């Protein structure tokens, strides 16, 4: 009997182990539901370049992404092509997905459809219900429509998308407590033909941006549900762009708190000063990243003692509710007064500061003691709030945000300002500029994003991604995209390709070109590397071919460069392209400039280059590998991108390389002052001329002949 029990126990244990393994290896099925934008209309090789296809690459093997998009479809069941009447809709239900991404509403704005607008809410709700009733109990996530840049409303109407569809999707998310991802601002507020060639459908590059934003959201690791904050019986709910908000009071003071649907570890939060709901895009994006957004009213107090006391009480309340001990402070305009005055009193409680056109000196605003007009009414209110007995006392006061620079620098608080350079209300020269100068003197520079020609309004950035990245970096929560292997999505013939070629066809041609060869040299990189030309038939611009043929000989070398590639794209190609089929004696890698141009910093770019080199060591075990990092960019030594370039090479120079020889090529192309030598670069000071390729070819020859 005991033996039988023991056998049953062992069998049960084995079963449970097998079950746990299979459960842990369960593929997460993602259904992308939508219209032509989901389908990938107008995108060359849409099977690999539509947003669902690129999302699959981005999410990796733990996910299975399927495209159920149908061009022209509507959420309206009374529309001219209802999604619920398509075969794809039935297939998406039969798929029993774990996650459903719904992106509909654009075609509903056509005149023949929007005449039924009163049915939109209920018809969209019925679509949501259909997925929520599935046996797989999927996460249903609503995607707001992307912005449309069409010029009129004869068909799809941009104004209706912005003013009616977008808010309705947010309302549905709020009512159903559904996760929501804001795509509306992703492509900015002015048309970019690279991202949306026909002003309606994203290109492969635009689809890649969609995939990255959605992918970053889906790859967040949900934390265990925490106890909801105790906000009191009088708290009332409100809709904050699809998220769950609550109005409540502390000691009779109006407060607000908006909760994310997926809470980030540690319960990070933002305390916003003044102008609740104005330019909310940063707050919405941080909610998507798991941050709570909070507000405690300090209106008409101008950062005075009473304002500081209110925030002290609010901070204590949030700490008792289990929120992070360090808060993100966000202030626009006069909100800068309370942000900096509170931070100076509580530097150890501040994670970072994002200030937008902030008032840093009462003399500038509201007193108007400089170039700005100031505000007479606000000056009178400010004098009362501070209990100043006279205007002269206020002018002599030494408790302005500018006066806190030394304290804030000592605390090493990360600080970002976003300013309009033509601000006539809170002039940059009287507020941010002197503060920036002081912080630099105290060895803690701040970051300033300038908006040329912009006045005091509009605040923020239309696409807040740089602000969000700054906040995440302060918490150490940024993911380095430079080291994440994904295919590229370049598609333009201006990339130096024959018409009709796109990234995947170029990548496939490289693989074919390397078959059955034994090369002396294989060059890996981006458009600069592509410019060597080699024997690739789809490449139309090859200024370096004659130079390399001259120094090495014909047919003994090849280029595997692709225009537009960043480190993550080359990493993908090396990992999956089987480039070692050409048995190269030497491999030379030059990559990273596109990372810097697209906003990656020097540190992240360096990590990407190192990841590429490490993968090359694995894939080319019998080759000598040379890493050039990236060629210098920008004409002058003090070019902003060159400064990040230098940071990249500083890190590469310090790195302890294994199986790789690192060479900094800066001196190949620059003079004694660090400026690019005449004639070596084209007018963009990114790409080489024939003379520049001649210099590079001779230097590379020296490298591979050295022992």
What are the functions of these language-model segments?
Residues 374-433, 437-440:
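The feature captures the conserved acid-bearing segment of alpha/beta-hydrolase catalytic domains
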């Amino acid at each position: 009997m005991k033996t039988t029990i023991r056998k049953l126990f062992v069998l049960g244990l084995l079963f449970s182990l097998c079950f746990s393994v299979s459960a842990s290896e369960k593929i997460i099925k993602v259904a992308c539901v939508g219209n032509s934008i989901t389908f990938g209309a107008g995108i060359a090789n849409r099977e690999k370049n539509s947003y669902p296809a690129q999302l699959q690459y981005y999410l990796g093997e733990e996910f299975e992404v399927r495209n159920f998009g149908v061009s022209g479809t509507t959420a309206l069941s009374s529309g001219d092509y209802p999604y619920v009447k398509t075969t794809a809709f039935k297939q998406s239900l039969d798929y029993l997905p774990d996650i459903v991404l719904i992106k509909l509403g654009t075609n509903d704005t056509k005149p023949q459809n929007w005449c039924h607008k009163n049915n939109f809410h209920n018809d969209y709700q019925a679509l949501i219900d259909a997925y929520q009733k599935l046996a797989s109990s999927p996460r249903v996530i609503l995607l707001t429509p992307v912005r449309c840049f069409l010029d009129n409303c004869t068909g799809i109407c941009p104004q209706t998308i912005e003013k009616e569809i977008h808010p309705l999707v947010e309302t549905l998310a709020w009512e159903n407590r559904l996760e929501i991802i804001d795509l509306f601002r992703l492509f900015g507020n002015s048309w970019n033909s690279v991202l949306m060639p026909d002003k309606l459908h994203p290109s492969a590059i635009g689809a890649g941006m969609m995939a990255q934003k959605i992918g970053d959201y889906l790859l967040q690791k949900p934390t265990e549900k925490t106890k909801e904050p105790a906000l009191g019986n009088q708290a009332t709910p409100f809709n904050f762009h699809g998220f769950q908000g609550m109005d409540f009071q502390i000691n009779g003071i109006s407060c607000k708190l908006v909760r994310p649907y997926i809470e980030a570890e540690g319960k990070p939060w933002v305390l916003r000063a003044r102008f609740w709901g104005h330019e909310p895009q940063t707050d919405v994006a941080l909610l998507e990243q798991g941050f709570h957004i909070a507000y405690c009213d300090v209106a008409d107090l101008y950062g005075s003692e009473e304002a500081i006391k209110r925030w002290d009480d609010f901070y204590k309340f949030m700490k008792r509710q289990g929120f992070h001990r360090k808060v993100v402070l966000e202030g626009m305009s006069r909100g800068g007064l309370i942000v900096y005055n509170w931070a100076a009193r509580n530097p150890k409680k501040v994670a970072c500061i994002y200030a937008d056109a902030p008032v840093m000196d009462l003399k500038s605003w509201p007193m108007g003691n400089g170039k700005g007009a100031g505000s007479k009414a606000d000056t009178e209110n400010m004098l009362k709030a501070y209990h100043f007995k006279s205007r002269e006392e206020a002018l002599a006061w030494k408790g302005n945000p500018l006066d806190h620079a030394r304290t804030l620098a000592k605390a090493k608080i990360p600080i970002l300002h976003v300013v309009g350079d033509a601000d006539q209300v809170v002039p940059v020269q009287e507020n941010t500029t002197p503060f920036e100068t002081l912080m630099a003197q105290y060895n803690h520079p701040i970051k300033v994003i300038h908006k040329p020609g912009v006045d005091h309004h509009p605040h923020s950035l239309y696409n807040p991604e740089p602000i969000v990245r700054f906040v995440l970096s302060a918490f150490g929560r940024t993911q380095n995209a430079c080291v994440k292997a994904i295919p590229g999505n370049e598609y333009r013939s201006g990339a130096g390709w024959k018409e009709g070629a796109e990234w995947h066809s170029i990548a496939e041609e490289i693989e074919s070109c390397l078959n059955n060869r034994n090369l002396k040299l294989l060059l890996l990189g981006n458009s600069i590397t592509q410019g060597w030309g080699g024997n690739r038939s789809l490449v139309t611009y090859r200024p370096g071919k004659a130079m390399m043929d001259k120094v090495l000989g014909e047919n003994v070398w090849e280029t595997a460069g692709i225009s537009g590639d960043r480190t993550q794209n080359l990493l993908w190609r090396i990992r999956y392209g089987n480039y070692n089929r050409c048995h190269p004696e030497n491999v030379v890698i030059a990559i990273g400039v596109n990372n810097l141009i697209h906003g990656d910093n020097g540190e992240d770019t360096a990590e990407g280059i190192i990841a590429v080199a490490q993968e090359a060591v694995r894939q080319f075990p019998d080759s000598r590998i040379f890493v050039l990092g990236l060629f210098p960019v920008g004409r002058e030594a003090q070019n902003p991108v060159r400064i990040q370039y230098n940071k990249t090479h500083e890190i590469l120079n310090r790195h302890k390389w294994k199986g790789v020889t690192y060479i900094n090529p800066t001196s190949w192309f620059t003079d004694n002052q660090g400026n690019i030598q005449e004639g070596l670069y084209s007018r963009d000071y990114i790409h080489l001329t024939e003379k520049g390729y001649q210099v590079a070819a001779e230097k590379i020859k020296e490298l591979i002949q050295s022992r």
